[in-house]
Amino acid sequence: MIQGIQITKAANDDLLNSIWLLDSEKNEARCVAALKGFEADQVVSINDLGQFESREVAIEAAPRIEGGQHLNVNVLKRETLEDAVAHPEKYPQLTIRVSGYAVRFNSLTAEQQRDVIARTFTESL
C-alpha cells in the first residue's frame, strides 16, 4: 500500500517538510518534493530516511487514460452501398453506423460515402 507523508521532524535537516510516497510492500520511499538534499522522483529505502516524525498527506491516484478501439458493425454488402451511391432513390431508409451514431447513408456527402465504403470493407484482418 502506498501512503503519502510530510516529514515534520527528522535528524536529517534535508528531510524537514519534504513530501514522500511510502510503499510498505517494497520498503521504498519516493520523494515528491524536498527543498534540498533529494531530487523529485528519487527512490530510496525507507530505512535510509532514518528516524523521523510525519503527518499523513492525502494522495489521489491520477486517472488512467486508456486507449481503446471503436468498432462500428454494419452488416451489408459492398455492392449494396455502391448501388446506393448510384441509385439513392432505391435506398431511402438505408441506415449505417458512423462514429457510434446511426445515420442515413444518403444523407452523407459523396466524399463521406466513399470513405465509409473504403473503411467498412476489408479483404482480410
UniProtKB/Swiss-Prot annotation:
Keywords: Organic radical. Residues 5-125 form the Glycine radical domain. Disulfide bonds: none annotated. The keyword tRNA-binding does not apply. GO terms for molecular function: formate C-acetyltransferase activity. GO terms for cellular component: cytosol. Coiled coil: none annotated. The modification Glycine radical is found at G100. It comes from Vibrio cholerae serotype O1 (strain ATCC 39541 / Classical Ogawa 395 / O395). Transmembrane segments: none annotated. This is Autonomous glycyl radical cofactor. Acts as a radical domain for damaged PFL and possibly other radical proteins.
